[in-house]
From Swiss-Prot:
F-actin-capping proteins bind in a Ca(2+)-independent manner to the fast growing ends of actin filaments (barbed end) thereby blocking the exchange of subunits at these ends. Unlike other capping proteins (such as gelsolin and severin), these proteins do not sever actin filaments. Plays a role in the regulation of cell morphology and cytoskeletal organization. Forms, with CAPZB, the barbed end of the fast growing ends of actin filaments in the dynactin complex and stabilizes dynactin structure. Gene3D superfamilies: 1.20.58.570, Capz alpha-1 subunit (6.10.250.30), F-actin capping protein, beta subunit (3.90.1150.210). GO terms for molecular function: actin binding; beta-tubulin binding. The lineage of its organism: Eukaryota, Metazoa, Chordata, Craniata, Vertebrata. The gene is Capzb. This is F-actin-capping protein subunit beta. It is found in: Cytoplasm, Cytoskeleton. Belongs to the F-actin-capping protein beta subunit family. Signal peptide: none annotated. The modification N6-acetyllysine is found at K235. It comes from Mus musculus (Mouse).
Length: 277
């Protein structure tokens, strides 16, 4: 029964607005407390921003940089609140983490023109894993509010030869938009999308791990953007157009009247030219 309850709860969460995930998740846990751990580990939540007081830069919070009640900054590698024995990446991986944060900071600035990004890496037995986080919130300056949260979890299995690696990428994007205009009123639109891909890539000085991961993330985000734009927003536009005419009502009546008159004329012509039996 618990498996069925979990499946139903996850299916429900997928259909609810992403800007209300925390409230909806809390309500579900109150209804079924036994699902608390499974829901918290399975449902992606909107990313929160914190400030690194050491270097004066923002970073994103998630389960992957949390140890107890403290969160590790990718910039200073310090926990806040301070934690003496918090989990840390190895020296080799920390160096790679610093380079990855700098690379994706440029990627975020190029594609999103703002926002916050963070990269966290951790060691595995035969390689390493990491998460790339990007958050961009709209300021409502054009009467449009919204937020984009992308969470890319990558697992890297390094082959024994050291020349190739297997990459497994799981990406989740949460997006919501709210418009408030005098002509169209208020409209809310939101949802989340998860996609996964696996690929083998060559690892060399010309194509290091960061470049390979960067290409995978870039390709995945482009595909998700395209899916959101063409399918979700396209479908919404079709539905709205079906419910609400863009033309003025008098013009619409005139057009329909013209259609009826043309139809009558064509019908009369068909009757007129029909040969006698």
């Amino acid at each position: 029964m618990s498996d069925q309850q979990l499946d139903c709860a996850l299916d429900l969460m997928r259909r609810l607005p992403p800007q209300q995930i925390e409230k909806n998740l809390s309500d579900l846990i109150d209804l079924v407390p036994s699902l608390c751990e499974d829901l918290l580990s399975s449902v992606d939540q909107p990313l929160k921003i914190a400030r690194d007081k050491v270097v004066g830069k923002d970073y994103l919070l998630c389960d992957y940089n949390r140890d107890g009640d403290s969160y590790r900054s990718p910039w200073s590698n310090k926990y806040d609140p301070p934690l003496e024995d918090g989990a840390m990446p190895s020296a080799r991986l920390r160096k790679l983490e610093v380079e990855a944060n700098n690379a994706f900071d440029q990627y975020r600035d190029l594609y999103f023109e703002g926002g916050v990004s963070s990269v966290y890496l951790w060691d595995l037995d035969h390689g390493f894993a990491g998460v790339i986080l990007i958050k961009k919130a709209g300021d409502g300056s054009k009467k449009i509010k919204g937020c984009w949260d992308s969470i890319h979890v990558v697992e890297v299995q390094e082959k024994s030869s050291g020349r190739t690696a297997h990459y497994k990428l799981t990406s989740t994007v949460m997006l919501w938009l709210q418009t408030n205009k005098s002509g169209s009123g208020t409209m809310n639109l939101g949802g989340s999308l998860t996609r996964q891909m696996e690929k083998d890539e060559t690892v060399s000085d010309c194509s290091p791990h960061i470049a390979n991961i960067g290409r995978l993330v870039e390709d995945m985000e482009n595909k998700i953007r395209s899916t959101l734009n063409e399918i979700y927003f396209g479908k919404t536009k079709d539905i709205v157009n079906g419910l609400r005419s863009l033309d003025a009502i008098p013009d619409n009546h005139k057009f329909k009247q013209l259609q009826r008159e043309l139809s009558q004329v064509l019908t009369q012509r068909q009757v007129y030219i029909q040969p006698d039996n």
